[in-house]
Amino acid sequence: MATTTVQNFADHLEIQQVLNLYASALDKHQWSDLEQVFTEDAVADFIGIGVCEGRQAITELVTGVLTQCAVTQHLLGNYMIDVDGDKATASCYLSAMHAGLGDYAAEIFTVWGEYNDQLVRTADGWRIAHRSLTTMHASGDIGLNGQLIKS
């Protein structure tokens, strides 16, 4: 097991806060908060949805999908974080619920998955440089026309 130092502990907390800020920004539609989550040149591979290159492209993808939902809730847990100087890897489980709109108002689309991230320490704090989402299970249909993985 790695030696725990005050800096290592602080890094772990800061990284977990970045991961949590992502989920909170999605659910509250606070898209500008994603500037505090991703590097400008970040890459996100939402397996089954597509690969986005750049923070702007990532923001446009999640905005386009989530504004078609009445409400969402992205819950994260089982954080595993490994810090190596100014780089880190992190993984966490995702349980995400998406409520439909209009004809789909009574429907829920649920995703269980795992985020795997590569982070870098910047002058402004930790940021995700690469994110991948692997879906373990998905169920439901809220009329997103294939924009989210369906099982």
Task: Name what the model sees in each region.
Residues 3, 67-151:
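A beta-strand edge to alpha-helix "cap/lid" segment located at domain peripheries
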